[in-house]
């Protein structure tokens, strides 16, 4: 099986939220999960809500993204809804904690949605961090 023949050192996801983990009272344009658990909606992570977030790598990524001039928030209590966990569910054979992961929320549901220009800048800053990490 092809899915069983690969290994990931780190998975970085760019995902939306559908008002299951983030709400109008605090809806950032971008948010990096320093610690995260699955919200359990749509049964993704319902039985095991643990996501293997690499805290040191996530904090390093936040610092480097900020250094690149992209404003990003971070969360030590991210509740990852199906917009974030569905990808991990299928990629990691239902084991959300199978590989070290960094979850990045891109607000695509609540006004004011970040511009395409800002979103591309975020992706560029993340890629620069991964290519030239210390």
What is the predicted role of each segment?
Residues 1-134:
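Active-site histidine-anchored catalytic micro-motif
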